[in-house]
Design a protein with these regions (language model features):
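Phosphate/pyrophosphate-binding loops at sites that engage ATP/ADP/AMP, CoA/4′-phosphopantetheine
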Residues: 51, 77-93, 234-251
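Glycine-rich phosphate-binding loops at beta-strand->alpha-helix junctions
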Residues: 98-105, 252-265
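Short acidic, glycine/serine/threonine-rich loops at helix termini
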Residues: 16, 106-108, 137, 164-168
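Flexible, glycine-rich active-site loops centered on histidine and acidic residues
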Residues: 145-178
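Conserved catalytic cysteine-centered active-site region
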Residues: 37-45, 53-54, 99-151
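Condensing-enzyme catalytic core mediating Claisen C-C bond formation in acyl metabolism
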Residues: 1-69, 168-230, 234-238, 242
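Acidic, glycine-rich active-site loops and adjacent beta-strand->loop/helix elements
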Residues: 10, 98-103, 128-132, 156-162, ...
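Buried hydrophobic positions in well-ordered alpha/beta secondary-structure cores of metabolic enzymes
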Residues: 4, 33, 81, 92-95, ...
């Protein structure tokens, strides 16, 4: 059992609307975007003028132009989680982070976030792309409770727009930036808890979605969506079978929000 004491989020102020993407003249418009992916707007750590003028042709320049560092966005989310938990940074005994858009291969994102927060504790990264939050929770849930500190902070700073080619409509319409954080405990009880978790991977499909080192995001959209729909459906049925009965109809599903079409299907 893993208790949830507080959860937090942060998203940057700059908004990429469908109208903004239409004005980039990359062969898309609002009707096409809403029909294909169902996204109305997304946030970015990049200045809108930078995207408008360069379409992010130089990935290195995108980090220099960025209005926030990953450590900063992680810290904003973490402070909200800590405040909701009624805790201070000094109460945290372990920090785990993960990001698909790290600024450095080393040091760990967790160490930089901890430094931003003034936390002096062990730090390491667990990154699993879209499933990073779930994998971090699953890992902690499988660890020996008496070996964990009273409170653990997990953070997920995802600022992927720095790795998007804004001349490519298939990827430009998808991504926004945001960071999340949670304060967890295996020993101190709270009103909410993770009762059960399971994880899975399809290693043979490793090349279907990727951000190569020094490159842009790319994916085989049809293959990825088909796989996601199939596996999400299987997971929902498994959860309903295990926990849906005798729950007074209070079962709720929160799915990965990459694509409205996938959720509706």
């Amino acid at each position: 059992m893993l208790y949830l004491h507080g959860i937090g989020h942060f998203h940057p102020e700059n908004v990429i609307t469908n109208r903004f993407l239409e004005e980039l003249e990359i062969g898309t418009d609002e009707a096409w975007i809403l029909e294909r992916v169902g996204i109305r707007e997304r946030r970015t750590v990049l200045p809108l003028d930078y995207i408008r003028q360069t379409k992010n042709r130089d990935l290195r320049a995108s980090y220099e132009a960025s209005l926030y560092r990953n450590a900063e966005t992680a810290a904003f989310a973490a402070r909200m989680a800590l405040d909701r938990a009624g805790l201070q940074p000094s109460d945290i005994g372990l920090v785990i982070a993960g990001s698909s858009s790290p600024a450095f291969l080393t040091p760990a994102e967790a160490a930089m976030a901890a430094a931003e927060l003034g936390i002096d504790a062990p730090c390491f990264d667990v990154n699993s792309a879209c499933t990073t939050f779930g994998m971090q929770v699953d890992l902690l849930n499988r660890m020996m409770a008496d070996k964990l500190p009273p409170f653990v902070l997990i953070v997920q700073p995802e600022n992927v727009t720095r790795m998007i080619d804004y001349s490519d409509r298939s990827s430009a319409v998808l991504f926004g930036d945001g960071s999340t954080a949670a304060v967890l405990s295996a020993s101190v009880k709270a009103r909410a808890a993770f009762v059960e978790s399971e994880c899975g991977t399809n290693p043979s499909g490793f090349d279907k979605v990727a951000i190569p080192t020094g490159g842009y995001f790319r994916q085989d959209g049809n293959a990825v969506q088909g796989f996601a729909i199939r596996r999400m459906t299987e997971s929902i049925r498994s959860l309903l079978s295990a926990f849906g009965k005798g729950n007074d109809g209070r079962f709720r599903f929160i799915g990965h929000q990459a694509n409205m079409g996938a959720l509706l299907t």
